[in-house]
């Protein structure tokens, strides 16, 4: 199977960039799915209770929902010590992921080992702001490792939350 990229030379900065951003997109999908599974398990188990009004769909609302559930629902408080730091890690990685995915490439090649993107932040009822975002080869190994860890740690937590809710009728 070949997924040739027209106009992109093998081994070029663009090929490296496309591979890195592609990895971020695919691995983030796997990692964030763990949040979706956790939210779905809780939502279906507790449906109808005051805390559970609407299933969250955006990352921030999922993180807020899960944090609140771990703090306020007795069956889930056992996950608070582990869950809250994990949710914080998701928030940090999610911002970087959003910057890369929703930013536009600003330079045709890496400069000083970094690809630069321009990101427009939309601020309702205010002026938009434009900022530079960098995908730096020195930061890449740690970010790649964090994305892999979020997938693993998130899936583990999702399974344990689901299993704990099966035990508590």
Model-predicted segments: where are they?
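Acidic, Ser/Thr/Gly/Pro-rich intrinsically disordered interaction regions
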Residues: 1-26, 30-169
């Amino acid at each position: 199977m070949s997924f040739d990229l027209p106009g992109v030379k093998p081994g070029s900065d663009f090929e490296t960039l496309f591979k890195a951003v592609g990895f971020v997109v695919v691995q983030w999908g796997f990692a964030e799915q763990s949040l979706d599974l956790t939210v779905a398990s809780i939502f279906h188990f507790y449906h109808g209770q005051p805390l559970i009004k609407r299933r969250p769909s955006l990352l921030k609302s999922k993180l807020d929902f899960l944090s609140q559930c771990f703090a306020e629902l007795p069956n889930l408080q056992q996950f608070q010590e582990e869950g809250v730091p994990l949710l914080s890690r998701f928030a940090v990685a999610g911002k970087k992921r959003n910057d890369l995915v929703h930013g536009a490439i600003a330079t045709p090649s890496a400069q000083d080992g970094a690809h630069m993107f321009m990101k427009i932040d939309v601020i309702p009822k205010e002026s938009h702001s434009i900022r530079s975002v960098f995908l730096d080869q020195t930061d890449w190994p740690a970010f790649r490792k964090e994305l892999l860890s979020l997938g693993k740690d998130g899936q583990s937590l999702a399974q344990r939350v689901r299993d704990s809710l099966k035990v508590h009728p």
